[in-house]
Amino acid sequence: MSDKQTTENAVDYKATLNLPDTQFAMKANLAVREVKWLEEWYTDNIYQQIRASRIGKKKYILHDGPPYANGTIHLGHAVNKVLKDIIVKSRTLAGFDAPYVPGWDCHGLPIELKVEEKVGKVGEKVDAATFRKHCREYALKQIDLQRTDFKRLGILGDWDNPYLTMNYKQEADIFRALGLIQKNDHIQPGLKPVNWCMDCGSALAEAEVEYEDKKSDAIDVGFGVVDLKDLSARVNVDVQDPTDIVIWTTTPWTLPANQAVALHAEIEYQLVQVTTERGKQNFILAKDLVASAIERYKLENPVVLADFTGSALENLTLQHPLLTDRQVPVILGEHVIATSGTGAVHTAPGHGADDYKVGLQYNLKVENPVGGNGVYLPTAPIFAGEHIYKANPKIIEALGAVGRLWAHQPIKHSYPHCWRHKTPIIFRATPQWFISMDQKGLRDGALNAIENDIEFVPNWGKNRIESMIEGRPDWCISRQRTWGVPIPFFVHKDTNELHPRTPELIEEVAKLIEQEGIDAWFNRDAKDFIGEDAEQYNAVRDTLDVWFDSGTTHYAVLEQREELESPADLYLEGSDQHRGWFQSSLLTSMAIHNRAPYKALLTHGFTVDENGRKLSKSLGNYIPLEEIIKQLGADGLRLYVASSDYRYEIAASKEIFSRVSDSYRRIRNTLRFLLANLNGFKPSTDALAVDDLIALDQYILQRANEVQQTIITAYEEMNFHVVCSALTSFCINDLGGFYLDIIKDRQYTTKADSQARRSAQTALYHIVQAFVRWMSPILSFTAQEAWPLIPEQTDKYVFTAEWYDLPVSSKANLLSEADWQTLISVKSAVNKQIESARNAKLVGSNLSAKVELWANESLQTVLNQLADELRFVLITSQVVVHPFAEQGEATEMEGLRVQVSAAEGEKCARCWHVLPDVNTHADHPGLCGRCIVNVTGRGEVRKYA
């Protein structure tokens, strides 16, 4: 029959094909549709439905570290919350009852500063109670804004009942936590040097301190030896000339508080003599630093008079360079080094942690002549009423005037700054309340828990928090602020002892706070609580460090809420929290219960640009979160987070987001194909037993099961980038690059209810059930969009489901997995040859090709098993297998050569295969024999593909 006759007699066979059909849209339009879905979810109380589905199941508790209730959320917040949501959803899939209770940190300075901008400072334009009321209102507004943004990301949680550190009940329980720590004797008052911000007017926690470069005046100052005979006896040389032990410091303003000069017991020192304008002068300097110091003093030719170690000079008396009525001792300290400066350290216990620590050993006076605003107090020995930074040049000038300034150089160095004001802080001794690290073994207990009880992801987190706790000072928990949880202590005016009824008083105050909030403490007098004892006791008016608020949520939240429990399975935050929330939580839990509050810590990196720079508006690389969601939708953002290896810094750029968008489309298109080809399939009546499936369908279920095991393990180990990799690889290689292309012919052209089609649909049904679950913790919106489109789906939400039990054939398959891998390799080799033939204009599509294979014996064994069905695997119209010979073109497979030519015959109007028997049946013009059987007969039978 001629081509003209074929065209004239053509019949439209489209109606005889099983074409795919689904309501699952090709275009996601996530940025618009996600908002609608969210509204439906929360109207339907989705979170409560998830909880109801897990009643009686073993709990998994991820405890939410509270973000601060101030400002809009950014990409870093999104990374944190999405990671938490992925974990909660994957643990729910694993059958756990995994509640998620979000929280907010509500007290503290940042909110005070915002409120001050609106209503003024306390005591100037507004009273404290009114100020606290405004702080509470401001925090609530910020929480509402952040809650909306977090929900938009698809984070499922108890958003209507979050924990807030300013809730009356939680404020009361923070009180109670403090009481338990005090009862266990971990709290002590003290006049100790603390990080102090002059702008905040308050002490700062370690976590509130950042290091930035600062320009300072570095000076070398001489402390004169008072008794040269004493010195002579110590160093075994007759000393006649003026002798200075020289200190080097970058904080001249601390010199009025100096109480000693520290040397190291084992460092070698030298007594050297030089000639100055005033005559002969002796210096005591660390041996390794003599040359650099003498050069700094612009002097020459030092003569060494004696060598000795620092221990020889212990308790030698020195003259303070500025205060004629003060003499100070030489002391020994382990903190002294000989790598810079002079090897001698100016020691002011009121202005430094090391100074304070070594001062305790020598019973040195803790003197603090500086007020909270950085101004010398009226009682200061010199420069009273001057700001310390204005006094600095005057101190330097005074030292020069008395001949004690040996060098003055400006330097740039790393110096602690206030995290809020970005201004340099000072170390200042003030009466504060501390959690002692060593009084009751808190440090050792915490280190033991780190070593034995806590899992770290990644494992370097262990060394980081361990080193921080090993070296940290006592925790100053008191603050001089208005908006914070008070410290409900009564201190005896004479003895400084706490009231003997402190535990009972804390509970009494806590009960009042449950009803009235923290104003219940601030608005009452001491005698309202302790009656006539008020004449002998002062009520503490300090507030708690906000890190204590959040650090005690293991007690105030996990132990108080029925759906939660302590210790938590996991705390998850950014890497900065090793010195913040992770540490404050560990210390308070050890102080209360002598156990860690978490079983595992997960740390994620920060978001940076493609060059590793921090995202910031000032650098011009900041990407607003709403812009990302507009481009990718929340699901695209979630895929970006999950695809990143959070153990390192997480790069963000438009190019990266574009790649994520491509990955999302690939997954979505695969999912759409799966759903579309389940058209007309009812699992209850149409599904086949897995042992009755065609070999290819059994193989793909086996592969799906292997992928599922990889994915489940990756979720359990919190390797979400591995989940994404396995998911996309399955889409690209197993499904898109192999299985789905092969089954199209069977799906579309065999009889609708044939074993051949139902076998493929059965496999597709099982795969889509598993596939949607795999993606649901990450691509939550898309998974739920697809979920109700799975035939005969019973559960309303994928989020109440558990991992799918993928069926795998128990009997020996016709082809082994190794055989299928061989076929995949052959298919790849054939495709390359067809592509070459297409480029040479020998063939058009794959179905217009005839493929001849020359295969060695082992390959033939596999290929010949499939007989005529081999063409369906290779997606060609005709395949011929020959014994191996040097024919055709060589391939990358050993023992395989291929030749591609145009297939013989005509193109079937229905299946598009080119076959000799097309148009050989007058009643069915344009059809091949196989299609005639599928249209009018019992349908073809498949065994392999």
Predicted segments — roles?
Residues 2-280, 348-361, 365-383, 404-443, ...:
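N-terminal, positively charged nucleic-acid-binding surface of large information/translation enzymes
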Residues 29-39, 156, 168-373, 447-478, ...:
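NTP-handling and nucleic-acid-processing catalytic cores
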Residues 105, 194, 198, 204-212, ...:
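Acidic, turn-prone loop/beta-hairpin segments
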Residues 122, 212, 347-350, 389, ...:
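Conserved phosphate-binding loops in nucleotide/dinucleotide-binding enzymes
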Residues 150, 173, 475, 662-675, ...:
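Core structural elements
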Residues 197, 418, 492, 528-531, ...:
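Short cysteine-rich clusters marking metal-coordination/redox-active sites
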Residues 227, 362-374, 481-483, 491, ...:
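Alpha-helical recognition segments enriched in aromatics with Gly/Pro capping
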Residues 417-421, 606-693, 791-794, 840-843:
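Catalytic adenosine-cofactor/nucleotide-binding cores of aminoacyl-tRNA synthetases and other
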